[in-house]
Every structure is written in structure tokens, then in C-alpha cells.
Amino acid sequence: MAGAPSWLRGAQSETTRSSEPRGVLFVCTGNICRSAFADMYLRDRLRALGGVGVPVSSAGIMAVVGHDLDSQMAAEARAIGLSGSGHSARQLTGRILRDAALVVVFGPEHVEWIASEFPEHLVRTVALGQAASALRHSAARVPLREVAGEVQSADPDPSDSEWIADPYRRGPEAARVAAQRIRSDVGILLDTISWPV
């Protein structure tokens, strides 16, 4: 492209830059409990850090499309000052995955689904608990685009304790436990990732 006019070269590099995956995507089953709560929580915490320029989103492998946050998880969200409403569940697609620099899942079934449907995105996929365990003692902040590789090198196979159980229709205690785990693990990501501005 060396012979192209400078205005075209600049436009192409800008297009390439803007099309690079740069967001965080949370994936669970219905996209109304774990991933939706994590999405709301991380967005809120990044906003509190001064509007870090990272898109945060969520989707489900069997989404309850169009539904808001589950009522028990919404109660957990409100308890920590989040609105707990305004979410709209969506089905995970290849296009959604392409936009994410980091894909964060909650159970082995989510990894299996991505491996079956969109295996090319496994290199950017980690379990939330797995990421928290691997990054917890990190000496330096890890650039967002390098997180999945770093986590997969340090902890290639998530242990049972690194998965977060689905609280859907399991009552307020299950929702409380899931929300607490998500907040704790997302907190570790907040403290150990070098977030782009």
C-alpha cells in the first residue's frame, strides 16, 4: 500500500485500529444472571475510574433474548448501588465475539459452546475465577489484549473452584454467593489489568 495517497493510508490504518478487538465480553447461559451482573458491575467500576475507554458487554449461549436482569441478581445489583435494570439479554454470535479482546465465561459449558461454534475465539477466552487466580499476585499490570494469553499460560485448566455456579431460580442465597464471587473476581481484574484510556 506504499503507493497509495497519504489520506488513504491514514484512513486504512484508522479502520484497522478501530476494528481490532478491544472490549471485555462476559458470557454465561441465559445472559440474565452472571454475565449481565458482571457487565453492569465492571462498567460501573470503570466509570468510577474516570471513564476508561473499554467497551464492556455480555451475551448468552442460550440467551433469554430481550429479558432484563434476573430479579434475584437485580436485588444484588441494587444492594451495591447499581440500577439493576435496563439490561436486554442477547444471544452470543461470532460478530459479538470478534469485538472482544477478552472473553470471560463462568462455567465449562460456555467454553465448550465457544469451542464448538467459534473455536477461533478460544485464544481470548478465560473463566472469571481462572483469571482472578492467575492475576491475583501479578507483579505488574497486564495489558488488556495480553490477559487471556497470560491467564492461559499460568492456569491452563480452570479448577472446579474457579467456576461460578448459575444462580438462576436457586433463590436469594445462590444469587448473593454468585454476586459476591463476581464482585471479588472482577475487583482483581480491575486492579491487575492495564486498562486502555
Regions found by a protein language model. Give the residues of each.
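Short polar/charged helix/loop
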Residues: 1-197
